[in-house]
Each structure stands twice: as structure tokens, then as C-alpha cells.
């Protein structure tokens, strides 16, 4: 019944198996990928008819993680997979980027690739398997897919490169890099790094590139046995058509490209296609040429003009040389109510960035195949239509926005303080207010400025730059800080972010059939110099984090308690913790390890909540003195609430140093009296005395001391800061079972 074909290779100690002919046989291409206990089904479907006139390849990649793959039922009300998660969107883009450039340039048939994770093994990189499976499925389909792509993941642990590290290993790795390519060229790189040098990054790419070559071999073997006939493709346009358009309109196109302003240049260029189509109207009516052929030839001429200026004259359309960076302007503290804000402008690209602090309760909950976890740092990239002067409605975040936001997140994340050093959750929102190339790297720069102004103790300022490439044969030019047109007509978009000491994020996309390591080396070094220049401009405005938080930021304190006391703070059905929050106005978060984080809008609210918590968890010592409240009076004595929710009993003989007839003659419910703990009965209930209690020293152990280190950066505007909100770290301070391990106060 099945004509199954299987190819396998031992890769990094595990067997990678590709098979076709058993599942999804009606799809143009279908491959089952297996490694360890991971199983993916990757399919490719190609429409029979071309979709002419759209000007781009209508390729759609959908990566799906099925909950059953990890033995889970989807959470939420609807128990089925719904809208793609950010993780699924990011992997879909990861698959798309090395594959898209390898189709025939004239191919415009709608193409859908679906990669579904059917069984999940955390010991295997399913995103890498998805790229491999998608490439294999396309190689079997009729699509004119010109090269075969494979990919690998690279980590750096203890100075050694690790191929396809597990999730557990990635937690200790200095590098998380994905590289994809063909048998002779690199097509795509994406990474997060902990301040690695350009040399280390290049070596990591080489290591990954060499590692996936055996995978390309088995994909080729599978395609040789199972592929379908490829669609025959024609040239995009006749060569004679291009020559005729050049003869008539090249001067006008050159004049338009000589305009340095993006808006004016675009306006003039947009007028030309109508003139060209009008000139060829009779040829269009006679079906000698199609509109699409004419527009394609015109775009090719525009590309030639831009590229020749760069390669032959070392001159770009805005007048810069290949290494020049556009003019930079930085401003901080624009938004008075935000916890931190910055405006970063580079040429005609601009990003308005804000920073907001929250509690651990505000952290992003992520439900994945690995299980549920929280993200403390969130970065949202927004690209509104007005940034490029387009009249379009605002929509939900696009795949592009999700991808750009994650790239900026990778650039910033390695330099953030850990939760012990800085207890807040952090949300950064970067809105692109103008765009003419490299808006994601403007987001990185603006985020660094906003975080420092907000007072986040980042390790070092971070800047990002986008590099471009124009390549004709062996002749090439690497461009620093590319414009939108240079991205569109160029051959590469190579984004590099990092500090003055090293790289934190890298992303490379290629539009040609790949680049070699010589070009990558030149691009990395040129990016380093550009990054240092940008950092120099940023440092003129702010070079280190402020020592004080915004007056609008919440106050926070963290204490450590005995884990057995957690239930006492929470109370039955959450009654106690709810009462503390309602009466104090604070927010409280309790971790399983006994870490209690308290957040409030001001110092007084924080103190009320903290005192209530300490009163609950404190273990009183015999001989301590407390201010107690009489809760019930009996003939034999009185019950007194002496600390937190703890009550003790004062026998009638311990009420006074003198003889009394009745307890009620001395004590009434609600009275505040000093009591001394003198012991516990055989049931563990406290025995108290009022006699001579005021002659002994009072207890002060319920309030651990806090060491506060007050510092202030006088260079910042006084009116934007509250001098009482200081960063303060204290050493361990014991108070019996209540032990303050890291108390940080940012008080009003």
C-alpha cells in the first residue's frame, strides 16, 4: 500500500531519519522527520497557476506545535490549538528566511509549507528539524527550488562549541546560534550571544555550516529517488524589453535616485511606472508584453542604477560612502509618566521607546511544549503605518513585528541584571515613528537608552547596526547602516547588536544564493566599527544607568521566610494574603522557595504590608515583650493577640502584681497591654504575663534592619527623580525565621 522511501544519517550521536511515501501522500511534497523521540511532518503544496502581477513570491510557512506532541491538552477554554504563538511565528520566520531566496526569480505560484511537531523530545532541536524537513519537502515538490538547505544549532559551553545543544545545556551556554545554508554558502544566521567577539561568532558559523553538510547529502539522496518533475520557468522579462526601457527612461530614473530625501525620491520614482506603461500600451494590448514583465524590467533597471553607483563610484543614494553612518540624535526622559523613555533617531529612522516596571505578577506566562514558564523581560516592537506615510488601519502585531521585537529582545537580554539584582519585571515598548531602514536596530539603541534612564542596572550600553551587501561576481561592497532602498535592492540584511566589548545578537538574511566567510568577516568588522561610533553618540547623552528610579516606579522589598510559613501568609482560601493586600494597597508574590516579594506605590503602603507579613512569620522567644491586644476576657484570665495572628493566655494570677477580684475589673476587650512570653503549655499554646512586663526590654527582632546605600547621579534632572528612591542591597539579616536576604527600597 505504501511506497515508503527512507534516508538516514547519524548526526551528532543521534539518528536523523527522513522518509516519504507513507503520510500525506497527496501533498506535492511530504517528509516525516525523526530524531530521538521527536517526529515532525513537513509538507509543501504548490498552486497550479502562477499569481502574476504581485511582484513577490507568495510563500507561506506555518510551523505548528501540537500539544499532544508533549502529552498535553491545550490550556484555556477552547481545548484545541488556536492562533499561532510567538514561538510558532518565530520558527516559521526562521524556516522562511533561508528558503525564500532559493526559488527561481520568475516563480510566483502560491506555495504553502507546513511543519507540524507530532512528537516532542526536549533533547532534540525541533526548530532545526523543521528547517530540514521544509527543505526536503520542497525538494520533492514541483516548485523550482534551486538549492537544498539544511541547518544546525550551535552553543558555546566552557569555551567549546556544542552542536545542537539541549534546552538544559542552552541555559549555561554563552551562545544560541542557528545557521542555515547550502552545500557551499551560508544563507541565514540568527543568534543570541553573551558578549562574544566577531572572531568567535564567525568560528561558530563555520562550525555550524560544516556540521550540517551530511544532512544536505541525505536530502539530495531522498530527492533523487522521490522528487516530482519541476515546473519549467521562463525569464521574468525579455532582455530586449529592458534595453528599450533603459534607452527611454534611464536618465529620469537616475535623476530620481539622486534625490536624497526618501519621501521626495519615492514620489518621483512612483511617477515613472505609469509613464513606462503608457509608452508600451499598444504592446500590452497586443499581448507582446504584460504589465508584470514591464514592471519587473523597470525594477531591474532601478536595481542596476543603485548597485552600479555603489560598486563603481563608492557612492550611495543619500551621498554617503559605504562605511558612513547617518546622523544620530538621542533624547531621554521625553514621557514624564513613563518609568523611562528615549527617542533614538538615525537619519530618517526613528524609534520612541518607553520602559515600565512591574511586579513578578506582571511577568509574561508562556505555555510551550517544554511546559509553562515566565518571561520577566518583555519587548514589544510596533511598526505603525504612519512611520512610512501609509494610510492603513492599525492591526494586531504582524509576523514581522513579532520577529523584529524578538531580535531586539535578544540584543538586550544578555546585559540585563538578574532578578536578585533587580526584582522588577520589565516591559519595553518601541514604536517606530519613522522608518527608512534598520528600524529593529534603532529599537535596540532606543531600548538601551530608555533602560539606563529608567535606572535599570544594565551591564553596558547596547547599540545595533544593519549592514548591507551589493555583490556582482567577485566584486562586492559591504554597506554600513543601510537605507530601505538599499535593503530592497541589495543582497543582504546583516544586523549586528552588542556593547563595546562584544556581540549580543546577530541576524543575517541573504537574497542571493549565499555568501562566503570572507564577506561575513568584512561585514562583522565593519559592523563593529559602526557600532562603536553609535555607542559614542549615545554615551554623550547617557553612558550609565541612573542611580535612582522614576518617582512613578513602584517600591519593592523582598524577604526570605521559612517555607513552612508560606501557608500562614496565604491563609485558608487566601484569606490572610487578601486581607494584607486590601488593607495595605500592596501586591504580594510568594515563591515556592519562601521568597516573598512585596510591591507598593509608596513607602507607607509597603511598610504596612511588610510589618503584617513579618508579624505572621516571626517565631517569638521566651522573655520577649510585645504590645498585645485583649481579644477575650474570661473569669480565669484573658486571651491576648500578642504578635501577628498568634494569641496567648494570661492567667488571672499573671494579670497584676496585686491581688484582683476579677479579670474584667482590670482588662477589657480591645485594650492594648504590654505582655511577656513566659512559656508554652503542653499543647504549644503561649503563656503570657502582664506583671512586670514593662520593666524588661521590648522585642525588636520582628523588624530586620536594612542597610541602605544611598547614591545619586547629579547629572540627571532633579524634577524627574525622587531622591528617596535609592537602589539598596543589604546583606543577610537574621530575625529568627524571618531573614531578609535582599531588601531593595525605591521609596517615595
Curated annotation (Swiss-Prot):
Involved in mRNA degradation. Catalyzes the phosphorolysis of single-stranded polyribonucleotides processively in the 3'- to 5'-direction. This is Polyribonucleotide nucleotidyltransferase. The gene is pnp. It comes from the Bacteria. The keyword Lyase does not apply. Its cofactor is Mg(2+). Mg(2+) binds at residues 487, 493. CDD domains: KH-I_PNPase, RNase_PH_PNPase_1, RNase_PH_PNPase_2. GO terms for biological process: mRNA catabolic process; RNA processing. Its EC number is 2.7.7.8. Residues 554-613 form the KH domain. NCBIfam families: polynuc_phos, PRK11824.1. The keyword Nuclease does not apply. It catalyses: RNA(n+1) + phosphate = RNA(n) + a ribonucleoside 5'-diphosphate. Signal peptide: none annotated. It is an enzyme of class 2 (transferase). Keywords: Cytoplasm, Magnesium, Metal-binding, Nucleotidyltransferase, RNA-binding, Transferase. Residues 691-748 are annotated as: Disordered.
